[in-house]
């Protein structure tokens, strides 16, 4: 996802360099000219029939054949030719070990190993938050990543690189791009603990129903909301509303990033940013007025059934796709006074 963050592929292509994604999901999206919708399973939203049609057009596969095994073999054959003729290989890093200077790449397809096996030039780029102190720490994180991302004890391939192949070059790029500023932000520093496992997306009720493309930041879900706000709050402020504050993301996070709490803090900052929703501010002000004055609250409860009928007659947007619920004939206060509630 670092390439997406830095918009690396368009830059290289503009320089006349052919870029080929080697992860199968990323390759599918590259051929479709689409962005990833999940940080672990980038093409999870694409149906196999769509992949079949795409490969028929781009790779010359059989017409109408959408068998996953057949399509996988076709992609492997095509990518193998790319691997054999590549002049450079660029990988990210799931982790980097400070004590040994090695980088660690976790995959289930072996594409990282294939990619670096032929070219003499290998480049590894990763964010500074990926650095762990030693191999003992690495062992903990590799298990956390696999189990939280896909439920595996460990990924199929866990590859370590720390020096160039014989006669080759190995360049390591450690990216800041605003991360050092996050380190100085005491309220949101924990965001850098994220290991990009995607567990928060898998459990988020908003993401599961709306998908990755409903967010404006390139990383969707709860972690993407926070990262987007840290990157450019005036541009990505609309994402903070895509959260039910159910706290499920905070509960499942393997590294205990308090995602929901941070989203809640971002919502509190919207007014300072000048991006608070005007209607919500009016409604919140009205609720504050009513809650502090029992007579106003009781009057509102008495008038609520009338308001509901008016809204139903007006055919408001909420009622176009669902039935508007009816208000109870008696509110709680009335039932309490009549002794109906004990």
Q: Where are the predicted features?
A:
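The feature marks the mature, well-folded catalytic cores of soluble enzymes
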Residues: 1-187
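Phosphate- and divalent-cation-binding pockets in alpha/beta enzyme and binding domains
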Residues: 4-7, 203, 252
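Predominant activation on well-ordered alpha-helical scaffold segments within soluble catalytic domains
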Residues: 9, 136-139, 143, 198, ...
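Short, contiguous, pocket-lining structural segments
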Residues: 130, 192-196
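Ferredoxin-type iron-sulfur electron-transfer modules in oxidoreductases and energy-metabolism complexes
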Residues: 157, 165-191, 206-313
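Extended amphipathic alpha-helical segments enriched in small hydrophobics
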Residues: 197-201, 246
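Short linear elements at protein peripheries
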Residues: 304-342
């Amino acid at each position: 996802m670092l390439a997406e963050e830095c918009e690396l592929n368009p830059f290289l292509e503009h320089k006349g360099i052919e870029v080929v994604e080697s992860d199968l999901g990323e390759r599918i999206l590259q051929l479709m000219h689409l962005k990833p919708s999940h940080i672990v399973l980038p093409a999870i939203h694409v149906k196999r029939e769509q992949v079949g049609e795409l490969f028929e057009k781009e790779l010359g596969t059989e017409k109408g054949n959408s068998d996953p095994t057949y399509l996988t073999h076709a992609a492997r054959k095509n990518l193998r030719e790319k691997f054999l003729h590549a002049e450079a290989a660029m990988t990210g890093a799931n982790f980097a070990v400070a004590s040994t200077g090695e980088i660690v790449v976790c995959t289930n397809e072996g594409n990282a190993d294939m990619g670096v096996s032929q070219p003499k030039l290998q480049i590894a780029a990763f964010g500074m938050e990926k650095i762990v102190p030693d191999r003992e720490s690495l062992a903990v994180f590799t298990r956390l990543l696999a189990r939280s991302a896909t439920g595996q004890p460990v990924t199929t391939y866990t590859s370590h690189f720390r020096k160039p192949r014989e006669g080759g070059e190995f360049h390591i790029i450690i990216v800041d791009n605003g991360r050092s500023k996050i380190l100085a932000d005491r309220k949101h520093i924990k965001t850098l603990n994220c290991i990009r496992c995607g567990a928060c997306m898998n459990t988020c009720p908003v993401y599961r129903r709306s998908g990755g493309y409903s967010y404006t930041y390139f990383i969707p879900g709860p972690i993407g909301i926070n990262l987007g706000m840290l990157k450019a709050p005036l541009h990505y402020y609309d994402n903070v509303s895509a959260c039910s504050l159910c706290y499920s993301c905070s509960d499942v996070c393997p590294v205990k990033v308090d995602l929901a709490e941070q989203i809640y803090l971002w919502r509190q900052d919207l007014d300072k940013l000048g991006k608070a929703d005007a209607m919500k501010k009016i409604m919140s002000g009205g609720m504050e007025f009513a809650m502090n004055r029992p007579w106003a609250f009781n009057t509102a409860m008495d008038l609520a059934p009338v308001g509901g009928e008016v809204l139903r007659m007006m055919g408001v947007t909420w009622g176009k796709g669902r039935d508007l619920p009816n208000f109870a004939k008696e509110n709680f206060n009335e039932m309490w006074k009549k002794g109906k509630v004990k």
